[in-house]
């Protein structure tokens, strides 16, 4: 008999398009479902799948949680494709369609019967590895039973076995106490083979050194056996021989020995000695030694989260942290994803160790708070918060990815807080990555505690933030933090020109090396990647020194200094994304910059961007030192800079292009401030001129165009001017400054 299923087919998930292997009269008779062993989801045409062709469909939804795609034909028996009326003309095509619909209904009924619980070749019902549900309790001896009946029966049997185990344990405890009674002058009990005979023995060895002088009797399962009647004993070898009845498996055998003196010293020196000495805690020395050994092993191997069986990931992590702190060890994570439904709380001296790039802690869909946080860590911006009572110290995290699970949609408010929130001192982060977070990526703060172990400074290295809704990485506090390889990509996605990639402050100083911020489109955040952070590097505090870095993609400034005595050196920064902004904003005193200002982004008009802005309308800056090579941007905008001999701007200006790219200065240069800008050669020819100006009050604009011409307002230079490196070739453009063959300074008329 043909047993093939014709109208139902299942495919494994993994593809997006699937063939329809059977014919059908209407698309409404075809059902597409996602299937798992304990779940099924019927999909809707157009919104959740669509037809690629008459014989092929394409899924439009994720298949997470399912392992099969089922395509089934279910022809309606009530919705007739052809409806005959009296007096109508019968056509062969209509008859064929009607006949096919009837055949389809019959074929589907046959398949349904085969798939329900068919008989196998031997006539047995075949459940085909599926559960049989709602099964009534069995009554007759040949009836099937359900799980409740089985559990009840096993529970009764387990209770009986438990009673036997309790009695056995009581016997062993009684014998152990009797053995430990070192006050007995004569009579030391020996339990053979830990209370369980192997079975078949007619004798055994009493493992006591030296061998007992005598064994007056044995107790076998409570029945006394006397020497000379039921067995013999050799005091030289310590062997019991000639048992009248061989022992049976699990017989409980106790030998009562006789010695000339109570051997306390010998007992304490034996392998059982430590188990006979008690401690004040109620345990024995042997038990305490075992605890110490376990502590030593734990300190070497760490407390493994996966060793806590039967718990959720959150419960297992909490238990591992508590145990690690108890034995002064660390928490070891496996290379897998841990899903948490509450924050992972880190008390002082907590150490988490994962496998770099493979261990991941992810918030479940039910949790919208911080994923990992220090104990009692306050909420808020750690650039400003100072709550000493909430601090922890000595928290270490190595090689762990922390994610909130955000997909980058503005209406998904579940993931609104930080991936990582640590408020403390002496924190060490190494190889930590945070991401997919609608709030802040990593919020790190606290004040220095140099007077205690694990105090200042905190150390952050190889720390990265990706796909962040608000601020990327905040390094707060005043604990002289040391940082290395800090990377932020795609921060500030929730709102344009509001947040920062890396923020440092408010005081105490941070030492940093190899910083990198940038912004790029990503398929996971397509609705939001147009939003860009306000600042790449935001310096809100004092005495911060950053060297070696790359900054691009911010809206208002790649580097913004609002603190004091800060230095950023050996870095490269690119033009801002928004127009009329600046690459480096100096809004705090005593700032030093050394680096390269790169060409603007493709869609940023260069003539509307400054490499540097000194001061704001509300903030006057002084003691600023800038040494830079500027390419393709206006050099510096003096907005609000003052202080005698306090502003020094030196550098080279790159090749001119569109109008305004070669602008040297806009705004007002204060008296007695140094301004040195040198035009760079291009293809062996000097395009501009060396310009050294001092005391040139009221200078508003200087342009250097592609031919070396000086143009713009205030064309005549006042004050002290030195022109060097001028071309000796006679120019063709009027107004160009050059040197003739006799060394005379001339201007082409």
From Swiss-Prot:
Entry keyword annotation includes Membrane: no
One GO cellular component term: virus tail
Primary location: virion
Any Pfam family the entry gives: Phage_T7_tail
Biological processes per GO annotation: adhesion receptor-mediated virion attachment to host cell; symbiont entry into host cell via disruption of host cell envelope; symbiont entry into host cell via disruption of host cell glycocalyx
Subcellular location(s) of the protein: Virion
Keyword field contains Transcription regulation: no
Keywords: Degradation of host capsule during virus entry, Degradation of host cell envelope components during virus entry, Host-virus interaction, Viral attachment to host adhesion receptor, Viral attachment to host cell, Viral tail protein, Virion, Virus entry into host cell
Subunit structure: Interacts (via N-terminus) with depolymerase 2 (via N-terminus); this interaction probably gives rise to a branched tailspike.
Job of this protein: Functions as a receptor binding protein (RBP) and probably mediates the attachment to the host capsular exopolysaccharides. Displays a depolymerase activity that specifically degrades the K8-type polysaccharides of Klebsiella pneumoniae capsule, which allows the phage to reach the host cell membrane and bind the entry receptor.
UniProt record similarity statement: In the N-terminal section; belongs to the Teseptimavirus fiber family.
UniProt note: domains: The N-terminus anchors the RBP to the virion. The central part and C-terminus probably binds and degrades the host exopolysaccharides.
Descriptive protein name: Depolymerase 1, capsule K8-specific
Native species: Klebsiella phage K5-4
Lineage, uppermost ranks: Viruses, Duplodnaviria, Heunggongvirae, Uroviricota, Caudoviricetes
